[in-house]
Amino acid sequence: DIYSTILDAPVIEASSIKIAETAKMYENVQRDVLIALANEYADFCKSEGININEVTECAASKWNFAKVNPGLVGGHCIGVDTYYLMKRAKDKKRRMNLVQTARHINEAEPKKVATQIKNYAVFINAQRILLLGFSYKANTPDCRNTKVADVYNELKRHCLVVDCFDPLVDTKKVSKDYGISIIHSKEEVQTDYDLVVQLVNHNVFNEMGFTDATFIKLKDL
């Protein structure tokens, strides 16, 4: 009754708080598993020379296909609840084999993405790289558990010259939490980048042009 007085959204009643929390966990874990499948299927498609984006669109023509795109899994829900579930299951002497496998796949994704960027940079002889987006998902300043940080650090580990631009995030908080200096305004972005990689789909990036550099999105790596 309290929620219905303060929320405009429909309120779904559960018989107990345990049911409600377990349902929310199920939703997050299911998405983690589906993204892991998309990531693994994308790898298969790439090995076959097939475009995963077109495959996904075609498959989505069937009404009951769960349209999930491959990508990085960060944030404070999807990649976190999975560990709560596995710990709870372990306490009950149960194993969540599928869930654990999905988590391994998604945890490996940042390193894989960094390797793809590095290889592409070598292919086009790019000396300077700009990453677009730092938050864990599009159109939010929230950087909790963002996997862009892992991609950035992996690229730096390979001694590449890399900057990251995100006009939505709190740069001081990013510096404190991750030790990474983020470019916050478009005016600060230099014009001598050879490769620009969009990792987060902020709408604001649609209004910007990077005509002097090779531009690529995460989904096209």
Model-identified regions with their sequence ranges:
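Structural/interface elements that position substrates and couple domains in central-metabolism enzymes
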Residues: D1-L221
